[in-house]
Amino acid sequence: FMHLDTVLSQIDKNEYLIYDSEESIDCFRFNESNPDGEKITFNSLGEVVSKFDNKAKLFKCEQKEQWTCGSNALAVSPGKILLYERNKMTIENLTKEGGYKAYNPKDIIDGQYDQNEKIVVKINGSELSRGRGGARCMTMPLVRG
């Protein structure tokens, strides 16, 4: 995989979009008492996330949509995300399993949504995907106050 954003995006406080392949993952933990690091092997990316967030709710991105950045969402605020519209299975999973409502950008601009609900804004991005990136990895992270 190119980088972490292509397989994992945090979309709310304890919610993650994830492409969780069957591959084991080696992680390394470093701290002051162990500056050389400690290798920890996990069976999957989902296991890694659950280890560090015991309240994690994982929304799966199918392999077919991983290539089109189905797990690469931009969270503009907790529970408010942008995702390529072509990732229909991922969006369906978010609406059925996560209580998200899917909108087109025009609906958001026109104020056709409830600000208290979790939303996924379906963006076209057909030209952006040619650069092999999704909404999250094509932006600069911001620190929110």
Q: For each predicted feature, which ranges?
A:
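Histidine/cysteine-enriched polar flanking segments
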Residues: F1-G145
